[in-house]
Every structure is written in C-alpha cells, then in structure tokens.
UniProtKB/Swiss-Prot annotation:
This is Ubiquitin carboxyl-terminal hydrolase 25. Recognizes and hydrolyzes the peptide bond at the C-terminal Gly of ubiquitin. Involved in the processing of poly-ubiquitin precursors as well as that of ubiquitinated proteins. Keywords: Hydrolase, Protease, Thiol protease, Ubl conjugation pathway. GO terms for biological process: protein deubiquitination; proteolysis. Its EC number is 3.4.19.12.
C-alpha cells in the first residue's frame, strides 16, 4: 500500500473545530506536563499528523487478531492520541492511555514522577521506529533484503558526516552517523546559530592527538570536520540546559529565529546544499532541574497561528512571544522540499528502500545503515569512503603501529581517569547496562551523536547529536601482520571479542623474536625495561584485575638510558604527562559518547538517583553521589568497549617508548 510523506498540512483530515479552533488542551494527571508538552509538539508535526490521521500504522499493525488486542503497541498508542487530539470536538482531554503505558516506552518511567521531556521524546520516537521495523521484518519474512527505513526515520532521520583530512598528503577519511535530533551546548553561546557554528567547527588533530594516516603510514597532523550529509525533514534541536546528574540548569536566554538555514554546515558530498527550515514548535522548561519545575509548549497550527499549550490551558500567542522564551527543545520543518537526489543515500547492505512502516513509498528514501534504536547519537559509527558509500572504511581509531599479542588492559585502566566526555545525540553502539533503564537510541536511541561532551556523573550534553548512530560493518577486511610478515592477524572490521560493527583495531605486533623460533615473550614487548627470557621459553604470568604482572612491570619500569615519562618526577615531565592524559581522556570520552555508553550512563544514573531519592528521602547530596557511583561503577566499567581499552593500551605503550627531553 503506497504512502508518500506529506510535509504540509492536509486540512481535509482535520475536524472543523480543530481546523478553526485552538489545540486540544491536555489535563495534567500528576507531573505529566513533560508528556503533554511532547505530545502537543508531535501532534503539530505536519507529516506525522497526516500519517496518524490516515491510520497508516494501525491499519497494518498485528496487535489485533480477530478483533481482539493481543498487546499494547507503542505506535498505535501514539497514533490514536495524535488522531484524537486533531479530531474530537472537545476543549480538553486526558492522555490516560499513554500515561498508563509509560513503561512500554521506557521501563524506568513512572507515572506521577517528573521526567525529562527530551528523554521522553526520544523514547517515543525510538519505540515507534522499532515497532515499524518489527512489522516490516514480519512482512519480509526473511525472503528479501531488509533495511532499516521507517516512516519515523523518514520524518526525523538525517545523517552527519565526520571527515578527517591528512594535512601531509591530503588523504580523506569519511564516516557517517544517522541522527534523529541534534543536541547543542549552550554554556559558551548566546544563540542557536553560534552553538551550531561551534558544533560544526573544524578541529586540528596535532601534538598528542595526532591522526594515523593510512597513506602516510605514520602519525600526522590532520583536520577533523563535522558536517551534515543528509538534512532531516523535521529537525529537532535540544539546547543542553541541564549540567549533569548533580549539576544545575543553564537558565540563560539563547536566541533563535523563525527561519533556520543550514547551507553553511552541509557536506560537500551532500546532494541537498540549501536546506531551509521554519519553526513550528518549542518546549520550555521553567525550574532548576529535570526532576522538578514545569514544562509547557508553543505550537503553530495548520493556519499558521501560534498557541501556548500549558497542560489544559491553551491560549493564543504570537511569534514574538515564542522567540522571547528560554526554549529547551526546538522543532523545525523544512520549508523547501528535499531534492530527490538527496534521498538516494546507499543503505548498509546496498539495497534500495521502498517501504515506510512496511508500506511501499512512491519516493523511496535511502539511509546509511539500519537504525538499531537510537543509541542514536546516535549509537554506532558507520563508515564509508568518499564517493563510495557502499564500501567504506571507518576513521582509524588507533594511533600507534600494530603489535601482536599485546593483551589489552582491563577495566582498571579507565577506573579513575575517564571523568569528562567531549549525548550527540548527536548521535547519537547499543551497550546494555543492566540498571533497569532502557536507553534510546537515537538519538542518539542518539539516536545520538555526541561531540566533546563531559561524562561526569551526569553530563552536560554538549554538542551531542541525538543520533541513532549505528555502526555498520564496511564489508572490507583489514589485515595486520607482524613486522617480519609472520603471524598476521586478520580482522573482518571488528576487534577480537567485539561485535562485527565495531571499529577494527590493530593488535600489537611482536617486537622481539626469539633466537630459536620459540614463543615470543610478552615481557619483551615492554619498552621500559626488558624482563623477557632469551631462549624463547614463555614465562608463566599471573594476572591481577585483568592485567598481567609482567606486563605491568614492563610498562612502568625505566632505565637511565631511556627514562619513561610515566615515571619521571621533574615538573616539565609532569606537565607534559598531564597534557597527554587530557588528550587520552578527550579521545576516550569522545568514543564513549559516539558509541552510546555515555547516554546509557546518563539515563541509568538518573533512574538510580530518582529511586534512591524516593527510598531515602532527604539523603545528603555527597552521600547520594557516593552511593550512586558505588551501585553502578562495576557494571558500567564492564560495558566499556574493548576496542577503546585496546586503543588506550596501544597509545600508552607508544608514550612509554617515546624519549622525552
């Protein structure tokens, strides 16, 4: 059954009262202002409203068998709520059904408790998207190639491109991340335009943060540039006003306009160079934390009139009043049509999308890779070669040269130093954290892509693109061998022990061979002092916390001839080491954000905090923070991606070998 996305309002679908009168007010059922505000903005999202008013989803849904409902469907609930709000001849209504089914969208949500509006929005979008994919999968029944397109993705989905260019040889490496919204840092900005400029500002990778160029085969100075590869039909922007789990709120005014033009931020590879948007909704938060205060929304109806929707109280407003508010979430709709050529991005499996919500579309839209929930910003990193989206390579995440048989350091390597992240979203890998909280993808969930955000116990969500970034196996094999050509390790786009959608890592190559051809010593791999045997006989090694004792000795020992900066005590070395730590921290946290780990931590910590607050009452803030960290530390550490641990080991290894004056 065909369906073409209709971006403008279809007045014939609206009831007379809803077409000429104000929006339907939604009664507050007990701290449900966040839910009411999100529902009002979704209701007045034209393409989604048109889709729901024609019952495109429920008419194909499998939740009813022989007229009896088998289970509650999140998309059916949303569709029915939106259609009712645009059809009934009432002044106010109560969103009873969706309020009573909160756990369908997020297990940790609780009726009667204040929740974050942006978090709820992402869960709703994610649930509807995944429901569409489930129905689509049933319809295909494994007989045809399956892609990750849905009506939700066609409405809210876009893609960001991250390009790293070697400043020595000019070689470029491109990577794409799908998004469902964008989260912007506002602490150092005064306007949405300024925040966007900072988000897409180029970055020079130099010093301790150099990039390993495959063409040059060495560490080089490079330029990293973020840009928009595919602009979404509906652009959702979150202004990151909340500073963290234990932080406050950024309550300053951030200016924004009715018109938003993204041409300055578009990728050169995009077929859509001039996307223009017009504001149609905002959500405002008044108060000092996401767990308290009050949410209300402004929406523009089908006749272009602005209304303030404050739960059941709806009043006529003006554009000037809207632009004067301290907005938390902005909703923009494209005012110029997306070119047909911009809808021809190649999917991860190279197939063309012909369906939306399981229905064929007259204008198929292709995206890069399937969405796996949001962990959007994202979730995983998708990669592609410039000019060839189907066969692609990710950015090289590893800085040093490969060395085989180097066991990665375990969790204790990251136990204390990973404190700040560069939400993204972005965009913004699905990493399950068993803390009773489901993370959206995107966003990022992230779907959420995140850039330079802090990961302190609730992070300020800077430059995060709620992505639904998803990692895609490029389909290319990367071969790594030892320096003498022996014992090569072959990885199909993934690190050992990781899923096939993670970035391939260079295992360590053996640096010293034995004289008799016996086993190489792990001890001989350590540059700061050699503890290995010379006859090729391997020594037994004990392990503590996942790190071999001989390995630890090798990494931390030093000699007079080749002093290791990790052990030097002079002030100059200490300062240089601190700079190295900051570089490692920045890269590690950027990776944690892009893979969705940061968002998992954020949502899990929020849920734990609320639960403990309810159970203990007025617990001291410092005690609450300590207990929360104790509760989640071990489980979250175990979820840190293995490729990140291996990369940090490699880089620390290279640092320990380097001679410093």
């Amino acid at each position: 059954m065909g369906f073409k996305l209709q971006m403008s309002w279809m007045p014939s679908l609206l009831s007379q009262k809803r077409r000429n009168g104000p929006p339907l007010g939604l009664r507050n059922l007990g701290n449900t202002c966040y839910l009411n505000s999100v529902l009002q903005c979704l209701t007045f999202t034209p393409p989604l409203a048109n889709f729901c008013l024609t019952h495109k989803h429920s008419s194909h849904c499998d939740t009813y068998v022989d007229g009896e409902r088998k289970r509650d469907c999140p998309f059916c609930i949303v569709e029915k709520r939106i259609a009712r709000s645009l059809s009934v001849d009432l002044t106010t209504d109560a969103p009873n059904k969706i309020s009573s089914c909160l756990k369908i969208f997020a297990e940790h949500f609780k009726l009667g408790r204040q929740e974050d509006a942006h978090e709820f929005l992402r869960y709703v979008i994610d649930a509807c998207h995944n429901t569409s994919l489930r129905l689509k999968k049933l319809r295909y029944n494994g007989n045809e190639p399956f892609n990750g397109n849905s009506v939700v993705k066609e409405i809210f989905g876009g893609a960001l491109q991250s390009q790293v260019k070697c400043l020595s040889c000019g070689a470029e490496s491109n990577k794409a991340d799908e998004i469902m919204d964008i989260s912007l840092e506002i602490l150092q900005s005064s306007s949405v335009k300024e925040s966007l400029q900072k988000f897409f500002q180029s970055e020079i990778l130099d010093g301790n943060n150099k990039y390993r160029c495959e063409s040059c085969e060495k560490l080089v100075t490079a330029r990293k540039q973020m840009s928009i590869l595919q602009a979404p039909n509906i652009l959702v922007i979150q202004l990151k006003r909340f500073g963290g789990i234990f932080g406050g709120k950024i309550d300053k005014a951030i200016s924004f306009g009715e018109i938003l033009v993204l041409s300055n931020f578009m990728s050169k590879a995009s077929k859509d160079p001039q996307p223009e948007y017009k504001l149609f909704g905002i959500i405002v938060h008044s108060g000092f934390s996401p767990e308290s205060g009050h949410y209300y929304a402004y929406v523009k109806d089908s006749l272009g009139r602005w209304y303030c929707c404050n739960d059941s109280f709806v009043s006529l407003s003006t554009l000037q009043e809207v632009l004067s508010e301290k907005a938390y979430i902005l909703f923009f709709s494209r005012s110029n049509q997306r070119p047909a050529s911009a809808k021809t991005l190649v999917t991860s499996n190279g197939t063309t999308s012909h369906e939306v919500n399981g229905c064929e579309t007259s204008n198929p839209q292709k995206f890069i890779g399937p969405l796996n929930g949001f962990n959007m910003k994202p979730q995983a990193e998708q990669s592609f070669q410039k000019g060839n989206l189907a066969s692609s390579k990710p950015h090289k995440f590893i800085r040093p040269k490969p060395r085989a048989e180097q066991a990665p350091l375990e969790d204790n390597l990251l136990s204390s130093k990973v404190e700040k992240a560069p939400l993204r979203p972005h965009a913004k890998v699905s990493i399950s954290v068993n803390l009773g909280a489901k993370r959206v993808s995107p966003v990022n969930g992230r779907l959420s892509f995140h850039q330079d955000e802090n990961i302190a116990p609730k992070a300020n969500k800077e430059n995060s693109v709620s992505v639904l970034p998803t990692k895609v196996n490029s389909g290319t094999e990367r071969k790594f061998g030892t320096e003498n050509g022996g014992n090569g390790v072959k990885e199909n786009g993934s690190a050992p022990g990781s899923s096939n959608h993670k970035v391939a890592l260079h295992p360590h190559e053996r640096s010293n061979g034995s004289s008799n051809g016996g086993d190489h010593h792990k001890d001989n791999l350590h540059p700061c002092g050699s503890n290995g045997s010379q006859n090729g006989t391997a020594h037994p090694e004990t392990e503590r916390n996942g790190v071999s004792t001989t390995q630890s000795k090798g990494l931390c020992s030093s000699t007079k001839e080749d002093p290791c900066i990790l052990l030097r005590k002079d002030e100059s070395s200490r300062n240089e080491l601190e700079a190295i730590k900051e570089s490692l921290k920045k890269d590690a946290l950027s990776h944690l954000r892009s893979c969705g780990w940061y968002d998992k931590v954020l949502i899990s910590m929020h849920a734990k905090k609320r639960l403990r607050t309810e159970q203990s009452g007025g617990e001291d803030g410092s005690d609450l923070k300590r207990r929360l960290i104790e509760d989640v530390k071990s489980s979250l550490k175990s979820q840190i991606p293995e490729e990140l641990k291996a990369d940090l080991v490699n880089r620390i290894w290279e640092i320990s070998k380097k001679k410093y004056s």
